[in-house]
């Protein structure tokens, strides 16, 4: 059942098509997709803004802190209202780059699918993605507590799979011919004394 689904964590180098895979799945299933890069989020935008609410317990009134709806969840509900599509994927990219102040809330979100009192809508699943630390200086390694809350899938570049995709996308034959002969050039990242030199799968399309 969707409500029991552990969030997926697609883990692999940059530019190999993690986002494209999620978008293709959503398209083929005819479901919605809302994408966010977590590097762009502060604690306030992810969790919502605090405000004071008056509540009554018995005969007494008290002021308590509440939070507005998370910008992330609000986008999902907005998508449903706009399209009428109540099933979809909430895709959170660069999930292992969240700030230290946001990490505890993200840990809770991965387990309970909620920010504060606001939950991910029924019918929506969470898919996340991230890069290994050697490719991104902002990455924070996941500990056991976090990994226990997600279903980790290692994603690697595969030229033969990409070649089939490239033919369907009408990638120029000269590019495919070149890579047939020079497969070592398909995906390459190298740190030189001067700068980082790289070519990724994304760069060939």
Describe the residue ranges of each PLM region.
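AAA+ P-loop NTPase catalytic core and its hallmark functional loops
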Residues: 1-181
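Conserved AAA+ ATPase small/helical "lid" subdomain
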Residues: 166-205
């Amino acid at each position: 059942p969707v409500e029991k689904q552990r969030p997926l964590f697609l883990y692999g180098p940059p530019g190999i098509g993690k986002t494209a895979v999620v978008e293709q799945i959503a398209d083929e299933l005819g479901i919605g997709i809302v994408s966010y890069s977590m590097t762009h989020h502060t604690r306030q935008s992810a969790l919502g803004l605090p405000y004071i609410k008056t509540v009554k317990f018995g005969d007494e009134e008290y002021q308590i802190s509440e939070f507005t709806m998370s910008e992330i969840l609000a986008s999902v509900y907005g998508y449903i209202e706009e399209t009428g599509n109540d099933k979809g994927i909430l895709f959170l990219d660069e999930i292992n780059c969240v700030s230290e102040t946001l990490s505890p809330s993200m840990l809770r979100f991965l387990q309970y699918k909620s920010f504060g009192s606001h939950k991910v809508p029924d019918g929506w699943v969470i898919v996340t993605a991230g890069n290994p630390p050697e490719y991104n200086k902002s990455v924070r390694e996941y500990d056991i507590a976090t990994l226990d809350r997600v279903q980790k899938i290692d994603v690697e570049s595969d030229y033969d799979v990409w070649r089939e995709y490239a033919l369907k996308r009408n990638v120029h034959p000269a590019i495919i011919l070149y890579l047939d002969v020079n497969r070592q050039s398909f995906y390459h990242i190298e740190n030189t004394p001067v700068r980082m030199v790289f070519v990724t799968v994304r760069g060939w399309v």
